[in-house]
Amino acid sequence: MKYEGWPDEGELVVGKVDDIEDFGVFVDLEQYQDKRGLVHVSEVASGWIKNVRDHVNEDQTVVAKVLGVDESAQQIDLSLKDVNDHQHSDTIQEWKNEQKADKWLTLAFGEDMADDQFRRIANGLLADFGSLYDGFEQAAIHGHEALADTALEDDEIDAIVETARDNVSVPYVTVTGYVSLQSPDGDGVDTIKDALQAAEGNGEVPDEVDLDVTYVGAPEYRLRVQAPNYKTAESALEAAGDRAVDSVTAHDGSGAFHRERQLDDDA
């Protein structure tokens, strides 16, 4: 997806070197529709430049900083020397991520997706998440909940979530829930302790799952699960809550699993 309009001053943009002259370098902007910028020779690199071609090549992909935009003159002034290695690496990675997300949109809605639908969905994700990639990543981690406040239709959300979970690589996801546990009998402390051990799985939690149980204030305990994907994390979280509740109720206590704290969380 290429943006319509113009880049902002100070923005880092990805471009391809189109033409090299003695006075500077013309760069076609990869993220903007039909936009071209000029890197004056003084902005190609620090120090005296004898030959511009010693620093850039035609068709080279570069990251440039936007120094100024004159829409009336159709002119964009760029700098290569003002971009450090870290900025270059991050900007290229973000650009590649957006290219991936473009393909995911096509996977979600098909090759024959109408241009106006593509723009509407893409603009919706950009408005809420800042980038298409971040929208898909949040959909992969949090599912439908991540897109609930967007202007997308239900069937569009379904398609994005399904595609995200099939294609987005998330190093790990973290989900959190709470259990309220109470036991009125004389052995209540031991009953609660047994319930917490049950929540932790008694050594039966899969190796790919990291489960942590912490006390946050009577009668609530926090369950925090880290796992390689959303489905695994959610399954492990719900199973931990069920184990704790089943254990305490089996000893005439009471328990409940819930997503949010029932009291103010100062922990």
From Swiss-Prot:
One BP term from GO: translational initiation
Gene Ontology MF annotations: ribosome binding; RNA binding; translation initiation factor activity
Keyword RNA-binding assigned: yes
Matches recorded under InterPro entries: NA-bd_OB-fold, S1_domain, S1_IF2_alpha, TIF2_asu_arc, TIF2_asu_C, TIF2_asu_middle_sf, TIF_2_asu
Keywords: Initiation factor, Protein biosynthesis, RNA-binding
Annotated S1 motif domain residues: 10-81
Record Pfam families: EIF_2_alpha (PF07541), S1 (PF00575)
CDD domains: S1_IF2_alpha
Keyword RNA-binding: yes
SMART domains xrefs: S1
Role description: eIF-2 functions in the early steps of protein synthesis by forming a ternary complex with GTP and initiator tRNA.
Subunit structure: Heterotrimer composed of an alpha, a beta and a gamma chain.
Family of the protein in this entry: Belongs to the eIF-2-alpha family.
Protein name in the entry: Translation initiation factor 2 subunit alpha
Organism expressing this protein natively: Halobacterium salinarum (strain ATCC 700922 / JCM 11081 / NRC-1) (Halobacterium halobium)
Biological classification of the source: Archaea, Methanobacteriati, Methanobacteriota, Stenosarchaea group, Halobacteria
